[in-house]
Amino acid sequence: MARKSKTEPEPYGGVQPKKVPEKSIDGKPTIYTYATCPFSLKVKSLLKSRGIDFSNVEVDPMKKTELKWSDWTKVPVFVDADGTHVNDSNDILHYIDETNGGKFPRKGVDSKQDEWMDFSNDILGKSIVAVIYKNYRTSLHALDYVTRVDKFGLKDRIVNKWLGAIIMRMVGKSRAKMFDEPPRENLTNQLNSMSGAIEKDFFGGESPNGADFANYGILRSMQGLNGFDIVENHDVIWPWYSRMQLLSDV
C-alpha cells in the first residue's frame, strides 16, 4: 500500500467536495455507524424524528471495512441519496436539517445553539465516559453490551470485551481528570448547566434545534449503562430526554 503523502490534506468535517453515489444504499440517505455510538445516535434521532427513510450500514469496529472508501474513518459518515458525502456528527445534523425543511439555525447564526452543540462533544461526551467507565466492573458491563450490539465477530467480541474493559477503564480515568469534581458529581453539574439552557420544552424552545439532537444522542448512548440513573433522576433533563425519545423513537 502506498504511503500517504505528507502534503496530502487531512480529512475534515462537513460536506465533502466529491460525491459518492455508489455509497448510497438502495438510493436512500445512508448512515455508516456503530449501533451504540453516541455521535451516530445524534444523527439517527434527527433522521427518525423527521420521518426520513434511510439505510443504516453497521461498520465493523475492528476492520472498518465498510469505510475503506473514506479518508474519514470515524463514525458517523453520512451519504445522501444523491451521493453527497458529509463527515462529523454536528455537521451532518446541520446538513440534514438544511436539506429537509430548515427547522433550526445554521452554524454561526445562533450562538447559543452553537455553544450547546459544541458542549455535546467537548463536555457531555467526555463526562459520560468518565461515569460509564468508572471502574473495571462498570467498564466490563459496558463492553459486554457494546460488543453484543455492535458488529463484532465472536473472537473480536471476546477479546474486546475483556481487553477493552481494561483500556476503557484507563480512558474513563483520563476523562475524569479533565474535571474538578468526581465523575457522578460532574455529570450532575453538567446536566444542571444544560437544564438552564432548555427553554420551554427544548433547547430550541417549543421545538428541538441542533443542540437538542446533539445532546440527546450523547445521553441516549448511556441508557442501560452505569450512571444513567443520574439522567433519570434529574428534574429537568429526564422530562426533556423523554420528550426527545418520544419524538425520535431512538
Protein language model annotation of sequence segments:
Residues 2-156:
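GST-like domain detector, emphasizing the conserved glutathione-binding G-site
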Residues 68-69, 186, 244:
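Helix-boundary capping/turn motifs
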Residues 125-239:
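GST-like fold's C-terminal all-alpha helical module
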Residues 237-250:
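C-terminal active-site "lid" helix and adjoining low-complexity regulatory extension at the edge
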